[in-house]
A protein has these predicted regions:
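Short linear sequence elements within intrinsically disordered, low-complexity coil regions
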Residues: 28, 43-45, 65, 73
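N-terminal acidic leader/helix
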Residues: 1-42
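Short, compact, well-ordered microdomains
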Residues: 54-73
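Charged, low-complexity interaction regions
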Residues: 46-50
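Alpha-helical structural motif
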Residues: 33, 52-53
C-alpha cells in the first residue's frame, strides 16, 4: 500500500522519531511521513480543524494501526 500523505504536508524529518502519547506515556517510533501526519493531527486538534484532524486519523488507522492505538486512540 502506497503511503501518500495528505496534500500540502511537508516531511521535515529524515530519520524515524519516537513519539510519546502525552496522556498515557506510551511511545511509538514513527517514520518521517507519519511524523508529518501526526503533527498535522495534533495541530488541527489545537486549532479546531476537525475535518483535517479526521483525515489524518483515517491515514493513521490505515497506515500505522499499532501507532494509532498507542498514540491517538
Amino acid at each position: 500500500v502506497e503511503r501518500r500523505i495528505p496534500e500540502d504536508l511537508e516531511i521535515l524529518d529524515v530519520e524515524p522519531i519516537v513519539v510519546t502519547n502525552p496522556y498515557t506515556g506510551a511511545q511509538a517510533t514513527l517514520e518521517p511521513d507519519a511524523v508529518a501526519v501526526y503533527d498535522w493531527i495534533k495541530g488541527s486538534e489545537v486549532i479546531g480543524h476537525s475535518k483535517d484532524m479526521e483525515t489524518g486519523l483515517e491515514w493513521f488507522r490505515k497506515h500505522e494501526p499499532a501507532a494509532y492505538r498507542l498514540l491517538l486512540d
